[in-house]
């Protein structure tokens, strides 16, 4: 059976690999010159299932108002003329309640934990190397209020069976020795020992080679025009003016997914969250992070690769603008300079931006559609790397008619129809 996958980021490439293992004939098409050239190119590098949380959380609307007045705010909104932007923000606000947050976080943790297990299995089976570290993630709290507010997340971690440690200042210094010199700036931390790090682009490129060895064909530099349908079936995809036909189709185009789906009558509530990163050469390994640090105040991640530090964060709701904002670089430099002042050479840092495909509830869209041969694997937001292997494995099982190892409930696009019905009946807008 022939499958055409649109998109060669980490999600599309992993999907291709797992489908090829199931015996499918797979073709991957992308407009770029190689895999992982857009959102997967220079992300924060963290594989952090336990920290999988929706931006749409209780209290976020009030925080967003305060953030608008702050120079180094983690979230910024740049109004555009697009109705999609306002529609998406309204949907996000409807999810900012305790009931929705609990449901959405459970779904995100479910797919993320499974994804980490799939990544472990894949690494053991293939020996793929991507500067991986299995040393956990440490979320830093600068105030006691942040420590106290972590209680709701800890409750969900307990419910999901995710191991964690609450650290005081001494514990922080033990877990991340380079932070000993700045311990007085910190009130505590939440550490998840099973989290990992790794270079997403390196992983994707190497996995693409492994997929090719399984027979996957990658076609780069192609313009994907539109999907053609006939009744409840996708009959082909127009690529560079030519109709390409397959038995099944997978759309993994990230933030650009809605553009392809809207003409088909599928409303995918995905909007780009613009993020930034710095890649910094390490000058003193003893003064650099050991694994991944999350600064709760600035929502910035600092990740250790072999000889580099990757600093990533920010979320701009600004449409498809890919210009580099110097103020965002200032924020990233502020955070890494504050916590690891002697770890790397900021004068040699590389500044990058990418668009994360975010859903209003934070959960990716993985699974079937109203078209019998069209499947989606998109909308992973800031956690595409974390969720990629689990999403790809889940999708491959569904397409092969196998029972997945985790529940797929609430992960496909039909949940938004249920959410709309719940809202119309006056119930909380949880994507049930």
Curated annotation (Swiss-Prot):
The keyword Cytoplasm does not apply. It catalyses: a D-alpha-amino acid + A + H2O = a 2-oxocarboxylate + AH2 + NH4(+). GO terms for biological process: D-alanine catabolic process. Keywords: FAD, Flavoprotein, Oxidoreductase. GO terms for molecular function: D-amino-acid dehydrogenase activity. The keyword Flavoprotein applies. One of its GO terms (cellular component) is plasma membrane. Its EC number is 1.4.99.-. FAD binds at residues 3-17. Transmembrane segments: none annotated. Its cofactor is FAD. Oxidative deamination of D-amino acids. Belongs to the DadA oxidoreductase family. This is D-amino acid dehydrogenase 1. The lineage of its organism: Bacteria, Pseudomonadati, Pseudomonadota, Gammaproteobacteria, Pseudomonadales.
